[in-house]
């Protein structure tokens, strides 16, 4: 259970530093309310808050971790890279220190996309040898985790048919590791069971949850706090530190050669009846999240042609080999799929459509192919798509926040035999009404890629053979 207490001014100040403008917690009556300074009410402070040495303990927090896995001698320890071993060592040292100081064993693993958070976590589970729950935001990540848990030879159960069926199955067949989706936590009976019977809780892609909202995960961490808890993310939300306040971020020296190619082109102004109708909604509430900006961009015929020409040229010249193309809209995705499958055929071009029930089979297939083009949306590919062999990324959309950008770029930052990674962006549009907006958001992608993730801008002078760039240079010199 969380720590029920009044919040004095000093603690309130610390909490506001983490939460920002508004701080919401459950009060002692179970209401999720905003906390104000000098309140006389009592609130439930998540135990994970006290995992940081900067927060004074209200009382010692001791947990008995006695839910050992069966057949612990059969566990296979995974092989880690040196930089992953460094993280695992630091985490285990932190856990040991927390036990000594009677603080909660909560750690956020803030590790870059492609670092290997899944295998590193499996190593930690192998060391703990305690029963664990792995909580995922969606089913798309299940296969990735299932393969990883199978590799360490621990008895596990994957829940795909709902929490009710899982509870029935656990009566017949106990499991050392459960792989679930987060909506299972809306079931109180299930929460009580894992609180009692499981010691470790892993919240994968923790940035997907805003724990300042009254969500199932927020309630679970408040009322059924795990004994050992790991948050995994490449792009942490600061507010979530209230629930897991010790962050380990070990930078690794990557030997990947990462480049970002900026394909600039000065278009003649283009429009159509469809575009003109959508332009009317640009400065209205309909475009609050830039949905119409992206819809208009998807209708940009000259820009779409430039993207296609660039992809075809680079793929035929083997400049890119294992390529992922991402769009914001499904319609835009289908446009590129239709054109590219006509050019290269179904043995090369694959569709990453979340609506396709066989999508996991497609992802599995491309992992074994030497050259392919995989076309998907930012929604499907942004988090959890695990194809380590990807070496190139074409971004057709523009409007993304920093977290989304880093997640998308992370699709090609995983370790594989190939060491070169290329991102291709298109900062120009032929539609004058969104010209500056597209330029602004594309520059945001470029800046984050270079300054935070270590990509290098390709010198345009060294790429005059490339069709799209060559056309752009010719236009500029006329």
Swiss-Prot record:
Residues noted as binding ATP in the record, renumbered to the chain: 111-118
Motif DESH box: where in chain: 204-207
Domain called Helicase C-terminal: residue spans: 307-454
EC number(s) reported in the record: 3.6.4.-
Class of the enzyme per the UniProt entry, highest EC level: hydrolase
Single GO MF annotation: DNA binding
GO BP of this protein: transcription initiation at RNA polymerase II promoter
Helicase ATP-binding domain mapped to chain residues: 98-254
Domain of life: Viruses
Family, as annotated: Belongs to the helicase family. Poxviruses subfamily.
Keyword hit for RNA-binding: no
Cellular compartment(s): Virion
Alphabetical list of Pfam families matching this protein: Helicase_C (PF00271), ResIII (PF04851)
PANTHER family the UniProt entry points to: HELICASE A859L-RELATED, RAD25/XP-B DNA REPAIR HELICASE
Protein name, entry field: Transcript termination protein A18
Transcription listed as a keyword: yes
InterPro entries: ATP-dep_DNA_Helicase, Helicase/UvrB_N, Helicase_ATP-bd, Helicase_C-like, P-loop_NTPase
Gene Ontology annotations for the cellular component aspect, listed alphabetically: transcription preinitiation complex; virion component
PROSITE patterns reported in the protein's UniProt record: HELICASE_ATP_BIND_1, HELICASE_CTER
Keyword annotations: ATP-binding, DNA-binding, Helicase, Hydrolase, Late protein, Nucleotide-binding, Transcription, Virion
Principal localisation: virion
Chain's role: DNA helicase which seems to act as a postreplicative transcription termination factor. Involved in ATP-dependent release of nascent RNA. Forms a stable complex with single-stranded DNA, and to a lesser extent RNA.
């Amino acid at each position: 259970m969380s720590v029920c207490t009044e919040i004095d001014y000093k603690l309130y100040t610390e909490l506001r530093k983490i939460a920002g403008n508004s701080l919401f917690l459950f009060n002692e009556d179970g209401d999720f309310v905003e906390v104000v300074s000098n309140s006389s009410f009592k609130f439930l402070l998540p135990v994970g808050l006290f995992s940081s040495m900067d927060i004074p303990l209200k009382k010692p927090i001791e947990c008995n971790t006695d839910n050992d896995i069966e057949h612990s001698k059969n566990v296979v320890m995974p092989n880690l890279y040196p930089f992953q071993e460094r993280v695992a060592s630091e985490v285990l040292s932190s856990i040991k220190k927390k036990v000594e100081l009677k603080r909660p064993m909560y750690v956020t693993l803030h590790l870059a996309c492609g670092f290997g958070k899944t295998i590193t976590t499996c190593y930690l589970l192998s060391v703990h040898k305690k029963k664990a729950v792995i909580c995922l935001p969606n089913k798309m990540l299940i296969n990735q985790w299932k393969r990883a848990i199978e590799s360490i030879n621990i008895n596990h159960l994957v829940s795909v048919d709902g929490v009710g069926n899982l509870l029935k199955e656990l009566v017949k067949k106990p499991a050392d590791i459960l792989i679930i989706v987060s909506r299972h936590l809306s079931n109180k009976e299930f929460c009580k069971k894992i609180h009692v019977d499981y010691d470790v809780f892993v919240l994968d892609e923790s940035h997907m949850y805003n724990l300042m909202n009254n969500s199932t995960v927020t309630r679970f961490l408040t009322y059924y706090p795990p004994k050992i808890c790991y948050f995994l993310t490449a792009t942490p939300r600061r507010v979530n530190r209230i629930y897991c306040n010790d962050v380990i971020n070990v930078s690794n020296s990557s030997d990947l050669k990462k480049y970002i190619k900026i394909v600039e082109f000065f278009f003649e102004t283009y429009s159509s009846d469809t575009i003109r109708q959508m332009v009317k909604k640009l400065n209205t509430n309909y475009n609050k999240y830039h949905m119409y900006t992206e819809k208009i961009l998807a209708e940009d015929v000259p820009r779409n042609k430039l993207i296609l020409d660039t992809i075809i040229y680079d793929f035929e010249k083997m400049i890119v080999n294992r390529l992922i193309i991402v769009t914001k809209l499904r319609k835009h995705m289908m446009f590129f799929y239709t054109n590219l499958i006509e050019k290269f055929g179904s043995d090369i071009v694959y569709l990453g459509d979340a609506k396709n029930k066989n999508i996991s089979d497609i992802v599995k297939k491309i992992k074994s192919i030497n050259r392919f083009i995989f076309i998907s949306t930012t929604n499907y590919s942004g988090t959890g798509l695990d194809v380590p062999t990807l070496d190139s990324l074409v971004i057709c959309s523009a409007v993304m926040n920093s977290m989304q950008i880093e997640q998308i770029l992370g699709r090609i930052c995983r370790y594989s035999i190939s060491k070169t990674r290329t991102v291709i962006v298109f900062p120009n549009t032929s539609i004058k009404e969104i010209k500056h907006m597209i330029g602004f958001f594309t520059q945001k992608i470029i800046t984050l890629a270079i300054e935070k993730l270590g990509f290098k801008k390709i010198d345009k002078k060294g790429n005059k053979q490339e069709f799209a760039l060559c056309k752009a240079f010719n236009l500029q010199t006329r």
